[in-house]
Amino acid sequence: MAQRTGLEDPERYLFVDRAVIYNPATQADWTAKKLVWIPSERHGFEAASIKEERGDEVLVELAENGKKAMVNKDDIQKMNPPKFSKVEDMAELTCLNEASVLHNLKDRYYSGLIYTYSGLFCVVINPYKNLPIYSENIIEMYRGKKRHEMPPHIYAISESAYRCMLQDREDQSILCTGESGAGKTENTKKVIQYLAHVASSHKGRKDHNIPGELERQLLQANPILESFGNAKTVKNDNSSRFGKFIRINFDVTGYIVGANIETYLLEKSRAVRQAKDERTFHIFYQLLSGAGEHLKSDLLLEGFNNYRFLSNGYIPIPGQQDKDNFQETMEAMHIMGFSHEEILSMLKVVSSVLQFGNISFKKERNTDQASMPENTVAQKLCHLLGMNVMEFTRAILTPRIKVGRDYVQKAQTKEQADFAVEALAKATYERLFRWLVHRINKALDRTKRQGASFIGILDIAGFEIFELNSFEQLCINYTNEKLQQLFNHTMFILEQEEYQREGIEWNFIDFGLDLQPCIDLIERPANPPGVLALLDEECWFPKATDKTFVEKLVQEQGSHSKFQKPRQLKDKADFCIIHYAGKVDYKADEWLMKNMDPLNDNVATLLHQSSDRFVAELWKDVDRIVGLDQVTGMTETAFGSAYKTKKGMFRTVGQLYKESLTKLMATLRNTNPNFVRCIIPNHEKRAGKLDPHLVLDQLRCNGVLEGIRICRQGFPNRIVFQEFRQRYEILTPNAIPKGFMDGKQACERMIRALELDPNLYRIGQSKIFFRAGVLAHLEEERDLKITDIIIFFQAVCRGYLARKAFAKKQQQLSALKVLQRNCAAYLKLRHWQWWRVFTKVKPLLQVTRQEEELQAKDEELLKVKEKQTKVEGELEEMERKHQQLLEEKNILAEQLQAETELFAEAEEMRARLAAKKQELEEILHDLESRVEEEEERNQILQNEKKKMQAHIQDLEEQLDEEEGARQKLQLEKVTAEAKIKKMEEEILLLEDQNSKFIKEKKLMEDRIAECSSQLAEEEEKAKNLAKIRNKQEVMISDLEERLKKEEKTRQELEKAKRKLDGETTDLQDQIAELQAQIDELKIQVAKKEEELQGALARGDDETLHKNNALKVVRELQAQIAELQEDFESEKASRNKAEKQKRDLSEELEALKTELEDTLDTTAAQQELRTKREQEVAELKKALEEETKSHEAQIQDMRQRHATALEELSEQLEQAKRFKANLEKNKQGLETDNKELACEVKVLQQVKAESEHKRKKLDAQVQELHAKVSEGDRLRVELAEKANKLQNELDNVSTLLEEAEKKGIKFAKDAAGLESQLQDTQELLQEETRQKLNLSSRIRQLEEERSSLQEQQEEEEEARRSLEKQLQALQAQLTDTKKKVDDDLGTIENLEEAKKKLLKDVEVLSQRLEEKALAYDKLEKTKTRLQQELDDLLVDLDHQRQIVSNLEKKQKKFDQLLAEEKNISARYAEERDRAEAEAREKETKALSLARALEEALEAREEAERQNKQLRADMEDLMSSKDDVGKNVHELEKSKRALEQQVEEMRTQLEELEDELQATEDAKLRLEVNMQAMKAQFERDLQTRDEQNEEKKRLLIKQVRELEAELEDERKQRALAVASKKKMEIDLKDLEAQIEAANKARDEVIKQLRKLQAQMKDYQRELEEARASRDEIFAQSKESEKKLKSLEAEILQLQEELASSERARRHAEQERDELADEIANSASGKSALLDEKRRLEARIAQLEEELEEEQSNMELLNDRFRKTTLQVDTLNTELAAERSAAQKSDNARQQLERQNKELKAKLQELEGAVKSKFKATISALEAKIGQLEEQLEQEAKERAAANKLVRRTEKKLKEIFMQVEDERRHADQYKEQMEKANARMKQLKRQLEEAEEEATRANASRRKLQRELDDATEANEGLSREVSTLKNRLRRGGPISFSSSRSGRRQLHIEGASLELSDDDTESKTSDINETQPPQSE
């Protein structure tokens, strides 16, 4: 990153400091406090920590102030861990909810980070201040970068769209949406700035004359449009009051080739009035502030307060100067290419708009007529616009209007005049704005390069909600609604449809964001019509007002879900629409006027005829406006006809805007949209303030959360199979075999080779889909792979170059040796006399032969020169011909290119027109058939309608025949009059259409006459060129075919003209027939209905004929355009050289033939021809003007043709939409009809059944009431049971909470053991804890839901039982009906009971509704939990992805480990080889030592031979003094011997150097071996120590865990004791056991997750080891580099030694020369001076050489030894030299040698100095670099060791944790076993209790039997007593027996009975009294 200076650092507003965010303290605080989000009125959401859970409510403590509050569980939202703070993409959030999204946006906004990704789109919050993040440096930062490589920015979105456009060849669009003031316009400008910088064409093109002109103009288009189209509003200081779609075209290489701007709905009413504290358009204030005095006088400008249209005067904008902005606008216009006249004309129009507002009218005293008391302002206005003042005043005050067929002057009222002036001002400004946009498009589209694709930038007016909103706000909000629907459809519907279309696994998710109902409310054409359709419909009706429009709207749409009546502003607003951004109240004031946009056509005509060409150009289409007379006629009968006088060309503002919006939507659907959601932070326009509720509302409306969710759950990235294989096959080189393979199979193989998690991708039919981030990961791996390949390629290239350089050096070295050897040989031979003789004699031997050869060569040379001159001539001729042919070829190529271009254009135009014609014909046929079908359906509906009306009429006649007849007659009279008026209006319309057709016919006849006149002029020209024609008749024959084509087209034109005339006459006849029919209608009122149908049918026929006529006219225009194009092409070819005459002759022939045809047809043309022959001279002069006008007409015809085609296509689209709506409405009506019929039947059945039931229920209601009370009792019991179950559930939940608390305690203990693992382990534990809580909560809710469902089922069963009882009662009621007929009072009581029962039923239904509401609430909770579960599943997928990545890293690490093992083995082999080489070098050193000894012996032998030779030489010199020549030869031989000695010495030194080098290498190897051994020993020792430490830690952990296990056992015992208290109910215990089982499963899952985490950490440890090994490998590589550098140093030393040897050799020669000079000085005194001078020079050289020798002492020592030896030899030689007669020759020779030696010495000195300095500096630099590398590697090695120690420590902790988890698992297993045992024991107890109960039941049954026996005995005794009594009465035998106890025993016939005395007495008395006299 470049170093930045200054106060404002851009990185502060782009990047997040992750070191601050990854703070362990905040992470621990978050984990400990269990932080969540709760709702807050002030902050939206506040952070709080959970303290206690109380059922459905939770006690929380606010983090900010510590206050406590009770919050419902459903209102709590989870908080993300602190590591997700300020995350760049909100799709990465773990907990996705509104609170987290708002908190993230708020944190980033307060940190200056305004851009945030939200899945696939970007969210930007308006900062309300300037940020330094839009400079060119920032653009370069984002250029060419992928989205995930840089922080969020609008530049990243632009870069992504630009790259997608280039790669996919797909058009892109960037949609900036949001409310007004959210920053859409500014972001649009930044997009254009980025694209203009990145895709600038001048950077890569040399043919651009003005660098970047197009880009500069593109950038300057915005300031111009903002000046004329933006204004200050309450919400925004630079609010766009129009919409624009900027289309930037690019060529195939990505350069900008042009641009185009489309605008939508300028708010022109702002030009005449503004709301409070708002301004009009900027240009007015800029002009009044920035214009100079001269300009002000020209434009007649005044002060701000002098203009009525500036409602609020001058309101400055903070931070902006209107004067400076005016200068910028003018500069932008100049850059855009506006001329000075154009700018001045525009400013005149702006000034005239202000002058319109100053025109004042006055009401006349006695009439309502308006008058203009002072026309000063009118004079100024007319001066500016080029009009006549009197005509303007007359047109305003008394305009001419059409009444019937005549025009009359109508006086205007003051209100009408004011309205007309305001309408003209608005229309003038709107036309100026349209012209400005057209002019900018013309400047931007001037290039001829064809755009391959485009990027569209949409900047539309933002959503606006004012207190009262008008028609402009409706259009703006309608547009934003459509854009939001496009976003929803693109993000949610199309995305999921593509999943289903590709056949991947996907469950369709309905996000509930369909805005189509609101859009239909606004734009639906019928059934029922929408707002715009009703507005258009009201515009067509006479006497329609805004009030009637609102009434009709309420009538048609009052029941719509998105339509409401205003509640707050009932008196002010008219209706309310519920948009996606909120409710908007609309006031329908002047909506009909705004929709029609009427103008004073008298003034418009004056403006069209203005003397100012610019103003006339603005008002050129005055025939399309709606006149004010038409609007004023709305209250009269002529309004309808006046409104339709323009041949159907008039379109309302709503229709035009709707159609343009439809086109925009179609364009956007054909592009790949990139959404930028702009958010407004506050309404005060304050920086640094964010209103949370406002932002939340915008996020909800924009579907941000849903977009993030589908991005996370879906597969947003997709790529086709072929592209995937082509792009990522580099990652799987051997996965796909050679040969053909299907794309899908290849992708599947690649995916398997990439080892991707199956959850991360889906394979469709034609594409492969990826989750978010996967494709970016593959891109990174691909980049890394390519980087590795490039690095390897570079290494191979460097190796190749190094080997090549080494081979070259080897060749140079061998060449140097050859040169040295040859030089040495030459030095030996050059003083040898025979050599001199040989060199002198040898050339002489070849002289004679050379002369002969020279003569032969001269002859050959002459021949060759002759041939050369001949060939050069031929070559010049050939070059000349070649050049000529090239020129001809270029000319032909140009001609061919021009012809091909013309042919291609013509062919393309023909094909396009033919396709359009075919398409339009098909559409026309389709529409005709559809119209026929619709007419048939309409006829059927009309018949049905008539039947219904007849039925209604019959009913009305039955009620009141007399009144009905009178009303019917009155109604028929009124309808007949209305229809007669309507038919009259239609007749007037048809008459106007007929007149229009006549005018067009005349226009076409005039154009044909003009064409014929032009042909005659061309004929005159052809007569003048008749002589030339004779010369060019050959060319004419080639062009006869084109002439025939011209004749055919002319004949077709004539046929079309005649056809048009015939159709016009037919139309006139049909109009006459219609008039006759209307007369008949007036006479025959009784048959009005049938005649109306006939007239409507004929009207449809007329419209068909009209369309056909229009089609014919368009075809004629197209043919004329084709003729004109052919004419232009011929004219262009005529302008070329030597072709003008031929073209004229061709035209002559064509004109002749056409003239002959015209002479044959009419005699009038003959007269015209003679007349034109007389005027030929004048026509020649006017030819150019006529051609220009002709071209203008052709252009106009083209434009009209294009507009006609567009209108036809729009009509077709409207017809299609209308037909589709009709079909939909028909289907809806049919379904409604069926539903109503079914409902009627059902209601009838229900009525009959209810009556029947009422009669049956009257009798038995009391009994039913008793049953109902029984049902109530059952319900109460069920409620008690439910409460009991709820209490049990609460108990179970408390137990679960206790278990969770214990689990939390265990997690905290584990966290204490894992404290050094810091953030990661704590996060994982917290996530698992949350998952456990969530799962337990889900289970609890599911149990509650199941209990409620059971309760509901029980109630349903009770209800069914009641129904059965009711049925039984009904059956009984039929039987007892006769009995209760007389009991009327009972019936009344039953009625009251029935009412009471109904009340009870209502109470029950209310309770049922409450239960349903509770169920709905549970369903909502379930959906919320389901969403959270989805988020957790996404996180789980993310964790799985991480695990798979770690597994991949493990595999890579294994591969690296294997490679390292191979490398270590290779190093071992190299070590063995090095040892072997060392041994070899030792042997070699020994052999070299022996060779050295042998060399020394040879040298001694040579010295001995030398001494012998010297002795011989002395003898010879002493014997013969006259043989000086022999002395010289002997000296030569001595020198040769000395040279041999020197060579032997050098060889000896080289051998010594090699020996030393081998010894050094041996020492280095030994040192390396010792270091490696020490390293291995240290590694082994550290591993042993680590293992021992791990063992000790594990033992310690085991002990600690045993203690914890004991504690757990105690706690478990306490838990079992508490459980025993809860063992009253077996079901409660089973629920607890089930919960414990589930908890065990969760714990086991957690254990598995922790084991997986342990594996992950082991993988990380192994990765750390791998990194350590890599560091070691790098250190070894650096050692290798060091060795190579040492080898280079040795090589340099060798080169230094060789240079030193060369220097010694030179010094030796110098010494020899010095000795010879000294020896010769004894004989010749004359040479002493020269000798002294040479000695001084030699001494100087010796000093310099001694300075050079100071760096290498060893070499100097050797050099001194050798010099001493040489000196001794020289002294001996000098003593032997006694002869002086050769001194002169010797002196001369010495002088020559001295000169040569001087030159050599100078060269050697320079070379040696430079070489020594260069080598020394290079070596010093290398040594310094190596030392730095060594230090760096030492630091890295220390860091790696530290990292290894840290990871090993972490590994120990992980092992401890694993052991803890294992112990926990064992504990849980033991607990589960105990629980199972306890459950078995309880089951046994239950069985025993059941047995006891059975025993008790048996005893009870036994007692019951005994009791029954006793009762039976008692009954028997009572019977006996009764028999006894009877017998006593009869006087039977009775015997008594007394006992001691006073009791007596009574014996009666064998039976005995004990009685007391009293009893006996009483009994006997009774018996005696009742005893009769005995008969026996």
Swiss-Prot record:
Location comes to:
Cell projection, Lamellipodium
The region annotated as signal peptide is none
Give the record's keywords alphabetically: Acetylation, Actin-binding, ATP-binding, Calmodulin-binding, Cell adhesion, Cell projection, Cell shape, Coiled coil, Methylation, Motor protein, Myosin, Nucleotide-binding, Phosphoprotein
The residue ranges flagged as biased composition, category Polar residues, are 1967-1976
Report the residue ranges that make up the Myosin motor domain in this protein.
85-783
Annotated IQ domain residues: 786-815
Q: Give the Omega-N-methylarginine positions (modified residues).
A: 18, 1930, 1940
Q: Which GO terms describe its molecular function?
A: actin filament binding; ATP binding; calmodulin binding; microfilament motor activity
Cellular component GO terms held in the UniProt record: cytoplasm; lamellipodium; myosin filament; myosin II complex
Q: Which residues form a coiled coil?
A: 845-1976
- Renumbered to this chain, region (Disordered) spans 1126-1149, 1697-1718, 1874-1976
In what residue span(s) does the Myosin N-terminal SH3-like domain sit?
Answer: 31-81
Query: Which InterPro entries does the entry link to?
Result: IQ_motif_EF-hand-BS (IPR000048), Kinesin_motor_dom_sf (IPR036961), Myosin_head_motor_dom-like (IPR001609), Myosin_N (IPR004009), Myosin_S1_N (IPR008989), Myosin_tail (IPR002928), P-loop_NTPase (IPR027417)
SUPFAM superfamilies xref list: Myosin rod fragments, Myosin S1 fragment, N-terminal domain, P-loop containing nucleoside triphosphate hydrolases
Q: What is its main location?
A: other
Q: Where is this region: Actin-binding?
A: 661-683
Q: Where does ATP bind?
A: 178-185
Composition bias (Basic and acidic residues) maps to: 1129-1149, 1698-1708
Q: Which residues are recorded with the post-translational modification Phosphoserine?
A: 1145, 1935, 1937-1939, 1952, 1956, 1975
Family, according to the entry, reads as follows: Belongs to the TRAFAC class myosin-kinesin ATPase superfamily. Myosin family.
Protein task: Cellular myosin that appears to play a role in cytokinesis, cell shape, and specialized functions such as secretion and capping. Involved with LARP6 in the stabilization of type I collagen mRNAs for CO1A1 and CO1A2. During cell spreading, plays an important role in cytoskeleton reorganization, focal contacts formation (in the central part but not the margins of spreading cells), and lamellipodial extension; this function is mechanically antagonized by MYH9.
| Domain comment quoted from the record | The rodlike tail sequence is highly repetitive, showing cycles of a 28-residue repeat pattern composed of 4 heptapeptides, characteristic for alpha-helical coiled coils.
State whether it acts alone or in a complex, and with which partners, per the record: Myosin is a hexameric protein that consists of 2 heavy chain subunits (MHC), 2 alkali light chain subunits (MLC) and 2 regulatory light chain subunits (MLC-2). Interacts with PLEKHG6. Interacts with ECPAS. Interacts with KIF26B. Interacts with LARP6. Interacts with MCC. Interacts with CFAP95.
Name of the protein in its database record:
Myosin-10
The protein's organism comes out as Bos taurus (Bovine)
Organism phylogeny: Eukaryota, Metazoa, Chordata, Craniata, Vertebrata
